[in-house]
Amino acid sequence: MAEITSAKAMARTVRVSPRKTRLVLDLIRGKNVADAIAILKFTPNKAARIVEKTLNSAIANAENNFGLEKANLVVSETFANEGPTMKRFRPRAKGSASPINKRTTHVTVVVSEK
């Protein structure tokens, strides 16, 4: 049986747009977990808080479920897929209305051993 060397965590239907979340994920992809957490702490962004929480969950999964060492972990894979969109309308002049799309995101973070 092959030894498991990676762990995954997901945050689903998060109220941040996928485009903004991908900007944050690009900062941490390929970094070791200590550096990634430090980067996220100093990123002034709503998406950074969500990604940080998901990363900590992935680290906890690696330690508790698979017995991996935190010091050896690297952020191997990160992606933000589009979740369901909430559609709203903004009233405009002359009785018309404009659509507003409130986008949501499914964030996935995978950590693996070096």
From Swiss-Prot:
It comes from the Bacteria. InterPro entries: Ribosomal_uL22, Ribosomal_uL22_bac/chlpt-type, Ribosomal_uL22_bac/org-type, Ribosomal_uL22_CS, Ribosomal_uL22_sf. The keyword Chaperone does not apply. PROSITE patterns: RIBOSOMAL_L22. Keywords: Ribonucleoprotein, Ribosomal protein, RNA-binding, rRNA-binding. GO terms for molecular function: rRNA binding; structural constituent of ribosome. One of its GO terms (biological process) is translation. Pfam families: Ribosomal_L22. One of its GO terms (cellular component) is cytosolic large ribosomal subunit. The keyword Acetylation does not apply. Part of the 50S ribosomal subunit. Belongs to the universal ribosomal protein uL22 family. This protein binds specifically to 23S rRNA; its binding is stimulated by other ribosomal proteins, e.g. L4, L17, and L20. It is important during the early stages of 50S assembly. It makes multiple contacts with different domains of the 23S rRNA in the assembled 50S subunit and ribosome. This is Large ribosomal subunit protein uL22. The gene is rplV.
